[in-house]
Amino acid sequence: MQTFVKGKRVGYWLSEKKIKKLNFQTFVDLCRKQGIEMIQLDLSQPIESQGPFDVIIHKLTDHIVDADQNVTESLLLVQGVQDYIDAHPETVILDPLPAIRTLLDRCKSYKLIHKLEHSMEDDRICSPPFMVLKTECGFETLEQLHKHGITFPFICKPQVAHGTNSHEMAIIFSEEDLKDIKPPCVLQSFINHNAVLYKVFVVGEAYSVVQRPSIRNFPSGPTDRRAISFNSHHVSKPESSSHLTCRDNMVGQSWKPSNEVIQKISRKLHQALGISLFGIDIIINNQTGQHAVIDINAFPGYEGVPEFFDDLLSHISSVLQGQVCNGVACGHLRVNGTAQSQTVHCGMLGNDSSWLMDSEGIKKGPHQGLSCCGGCMTPNFHQHTRSSLTAETSSQ
């Protein structure tokens, strides 16, 4: 680790639940071994008295949601953090509070996805039609669905994309079940994707793709099937197995995610929001092969990503350095745990469509860098590439 990180101070605030789930103390110890001073923030006390900080890492989503609902304690805590940020523009915040607020509102994040889709002008990328429903369904609802290009079946999701209730969803198959929809919520067209979800976990310049179970295929158009309620978190667990995730009715093709497409989407989100720690849920249309972003998550759980701590330390080091490789795209490859000195372009590694199965039974794609180029992912072996996103964005 470079000497420039020694003596740097990094503040962090995560809920106790998040700290335990990530085993974050291991990361704290890793940083301290590299000479980085890690300070757990006490939000009940002025942050000014706990600083100064070169970087602050946080997951304040619970408090931000509560603050937006005028919960006094959370209002004060979030305002305290914002006051420190305003007073210390030199401190790097992972990630910016306005960006987190965007990701906590599915309406805002879906609008952003649509905007980015148009700017990318890539036929391999699509964003499902959606609309926001703020009141109970009425006679005009069908007209609104048609206006927004939403057809049956569609998914009904809570507008707030955080908390236990954010995972409670329903698939609506016909006009008859519109009366059961409880606003405020977001209605999003359902795309058949052969019951496979790809979770993209981004950390600075690196990302990993993990394959998870998802909702099975359903016939297009209205049917007499009753609405199905489900918890998306439970459905997409690695071990999930139910009638909802059954793959017996697979049709079309089972497409693998395109490395180039995922890099493009990740870079655009990074550029638009200035975020570094986020997850992207992607499904692939089983007829067209188009990649559809169906959700974006702030500071996800990184389950199935053993490189998370290494990537986070690398990103913090790059942030502290103030640049990445002097603006030149660079990277290293890790094969079976052994670091290689060469710069790697993802397209050099072939187009094998197999996926690795880790010790926990989680199906995974290779670990990539955002600046790599190439086509489909190539999981012949475990790949770990870091490259400079700064170099990519500076030329655009």
From Swiss-Prot:
Mg(2+) 2 binds at D295, N297. GO terms for biological process: inositol trisphosphate metabolic process; necroptotic process. The keyword rRNA-binding does not apply. 1D-myo-inositol 1,3,4-trisphosphate binds at K18, H167, K199, N297. ATP binds at residues 106, 157, 188-199, 214, 232, 236. Binds 2 magnesium ions per subunit. Transmembrane segments: none annotated. It is an enzyme of class 2 (transferase). Its EC number is 2.7.1.134, 2.7.1.159. Kinase that can phosphorylate various inositol polyphosphate such as Ins(3,4,5,6)P4 or Ins(1,3,4)P3. Phosphorylates Ins(3,4,5,6)P4 at position 1 to form Ins(1,3,4,5,6)P5. This reaction is thought to have regulatory importance, since Ins(3,4,5,6)P4 is an inhibitor of plasma membrane Ca(2+)-activated Cl(-) channels, while Ins(1,3,4,5,6)P5 is not. Also phosphorylates Ins(1,3,4)P3 on O-5 and O-6 to form Ins(1,3,4,6)P4, an essential molecule in the hexakisphosphate (InsP6) pathway. Belongs to the ITPK1 family. This is Inositol-tetrakisphosphate 1-kinase. It comes from Danio rerio (Zebrafish).
